[in-house]
């Protein structure tokens, strides 16, 4: 589902499909954060030296983690929060992105539908008279299952559809096709870094209105200027998860594939180039049929001097994108995670985003606003031991492997480790955070305790998600037995989405400076894991083999 903030920072646009047709909703939504109930209520806040706006306040039953009553502070625009929150020393959830806030408050589930996807790529001239001009654009539409190739050539007088004699007409045709086809998702390889910024930059240079590509007339970095537009991100590009094109999802397929590859524990890829990934997956890469032996010469001269090879090169790049995604289900895996989180698409990549969305939905308290950490607080991490000091080096026969299933999540459950379950009194759920990181004898203790009377948010979330993942795995097995390949893929993606979400939980408590971060929780989790590994190792040493 598409969840985009509008240019006025007051409305949210959501879009989905019913029977293949796009449906949308435009909804006003007030941006807000929280302060403690006894804090002073300022009447206005300053946006800049010319503009000030009134605050609105709302009383409710909101509480902080420590049980302090809170009240809501409402501002006019989402971008106002950054300055408005500085009027108080302590705020709560003042760092939640506007789209995240809307999804948490307004959405309970996301509709399941087939997204219309465009896989696309561009080539632009390197050197010469037409340096930096876009020469070819290729797109594949997964609804009509067609490849489209736009190109232009100086003095072109042919009649081939989508071929032009100038760059401007070619780009205008591409944009009009985007408007007509109305794709939900644009998928490219490093497209947010290179292709989309280049397209927007050339639009502005040629006097083309790039805003037409956005159903809600919002593109980050693009501003109206006189009779045209300017673009401020031509050099830097966008971040890999950014959603700059309001009303459409943009996906860097390289990022989605890399995450999936790493999840499968197949090792680190030495290169994320499309050529290397394609060779690794399929044993074949980009088209290299050209009269130029030097690739740089091909990029510089191929457009006009080896046109057929140049056009094929551009087409094959998009064919590879389609093949990578349709054989590995990279984009659908992220869509499955989005439906699980009930969140904007950009929330589905980093642990801090995934975890915070989930916890804000399920906590019965309001989290403090994150703050910059000048110096990280150190704590002991995972086990590290030296085979020489442990006398385990050498040849071993009759070796058995032992592994914990979900070690860190299991420790959260076993010790009831959570923000609200900390105990100042000793309990059965004690964690010795001084547990050694090797198999040496413990020489000191430093105990942290957790309550036993009520299951905490963190272990409760793990247990609920484990049950959900097991259910998805069961449905996947049923689909496999029924020979329904599409359902197998669907439930595999869903169970992997749950796995990724659970894996984010440790990362979020260890991410210092973030609102949900807590060093004591992180230290308790890693210490409990070390204790479990040490106990297993000591038991193994007692065995006679």
Where are these regions (language model features)?
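Common nucleic-acid-contacting/processivity interface regions adjacent to the catalytic cores
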Residues: 295-416, 484-531, 539
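Residues immediately flanking
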Residues: 120-124, 253, 402-404
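Active-site-proximal helix-loop-helix substrate-binding element of RNase H-like nuclease domains
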Residues: 147-149, 157-165, 182, 186, ...
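DnaQ-like (DEDDh/DEDDy) 3′-5′ exonuclease domain used for proofreading
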Residues: 1-182, 204, 316, 320-339, ...
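Conserved catalytic core of nucleic-acid polymerases
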Residues: 97-99, 404-407, 413, 417-418, ...
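Structured alpha-helical segments in the cores of large, soluble enzyme domains
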Residues: 166-178, 274, 278-291, 494-506, ...
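Beta-sheet entry/capping signal
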Residues: 115-117, 136, 184-187, 192-193, ...
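Proline-aspartate-enriched helix->loop->beta-strand connector
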Residues: 174-199
């Amino acid at each position: 589902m598409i969840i985009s903030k509008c240019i006025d920072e007051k409305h949210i646009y959501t879009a989905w499909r019913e029977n293949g047709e796009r449906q949308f909703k435009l909804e006003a939504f007030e941006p807000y954060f929280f302060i403690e109930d006894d804090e002073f209520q300022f009447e206005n806040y300053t946006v800049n030296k010319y503009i000030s706006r009134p605050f609105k306040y709302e009383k409710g039953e909101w509480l902080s983690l420590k049980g302090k009553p809170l009240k809501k502070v409402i501002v006019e625009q989402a971008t106002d929060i950054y300055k408005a929150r500085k009027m108080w020393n302590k705020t709560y959830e003042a760092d939640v992105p506007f789209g995240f806030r809307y999804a948490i408050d307004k959405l309970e589930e996301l509709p399941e539908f087939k997204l219309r996807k465009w896989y696309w790529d561009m080539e632009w001239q390197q050197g010469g008279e037409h340096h930096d001009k876009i020469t070819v654009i290729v797109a594949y539409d997964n609804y009509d299952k067609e490849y489209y190739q736009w190109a232009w050539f100086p003095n072109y007088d042919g009649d081939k559809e989508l071929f032009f004699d100038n760059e401007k007409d070619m780009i205008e045709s591409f944009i009009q096709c985007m408007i007509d086809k109305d794709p939900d998702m644009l998928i490219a390889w490093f497209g947010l870094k290179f292709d989309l910024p280049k397209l927007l930059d050339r639009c502005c240079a040629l006097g083309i209105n790039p805003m037409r590509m956005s159903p809600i007339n919002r593109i980050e970095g693009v501003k109206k200027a006189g009779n045209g537009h300017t673009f401020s991100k031509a050099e830097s590009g966008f971040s890999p998860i950014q959603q700059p094109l309001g009303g459409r999802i943009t996906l860097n397929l390289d990022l989605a594939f890399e995450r999936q590859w790493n999840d499968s524990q197949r090792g680190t890829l030495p290169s994320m180039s499309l050529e290397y990934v394609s060779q690794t997956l399929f044993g074949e890469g980009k088209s290299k049929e050209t009269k130029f032996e030097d690739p740089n010469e091909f990029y510089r001269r191929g457009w006009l001097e080896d046109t057929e090879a140049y056009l094929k090169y551009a087409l094959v790049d998009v064919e590879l994108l389609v093949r990578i995604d349709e054989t590995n289900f990279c984009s659908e895996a992220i869509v499955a995670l989005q439906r699980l989180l009930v969140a904007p698409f950009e929330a589905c990549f980093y642990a801090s985003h995934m975890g915070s969305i989930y916890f804000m939905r399920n906590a019965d308290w309001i989290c403090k606003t994150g703050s910059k950490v000048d110096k990280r607080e150190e704590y002991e991490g995972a086990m590290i031991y030296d085979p020489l000091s442990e006398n385990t080096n050498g040849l071993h026969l009759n070796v058995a492997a032992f592994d914990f299933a979900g070690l860190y999540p299991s420790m959260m459950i076993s010790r009831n480790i959570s923000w609200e379950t900390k105990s100042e009194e000793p309990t059965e759920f004690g964690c010795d955070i001084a547990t050694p990181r090797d198999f040496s004898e413990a020489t000191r203790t430093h105990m942290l305790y957790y309550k036993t009377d009520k299951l905490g948010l963190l272990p409760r979330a793990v247990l609920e998600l484990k049950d959900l993942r097991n259910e998805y795995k069961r449905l996947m097995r049923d689909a496999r037995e029924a020979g329904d390949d599409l359902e197998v893929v669907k439930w595999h993606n869903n169970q992997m989405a749950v796995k990724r979400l659970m894996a984010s939980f440790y990362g979020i408590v260890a991410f210092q400076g973030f609102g949900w971060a807590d060093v004591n929780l992180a230290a308790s989790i890693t210490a409990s894991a070390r204790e479990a590994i040490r106990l297993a190792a000591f038991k193994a040493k007692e065995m006679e083999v």
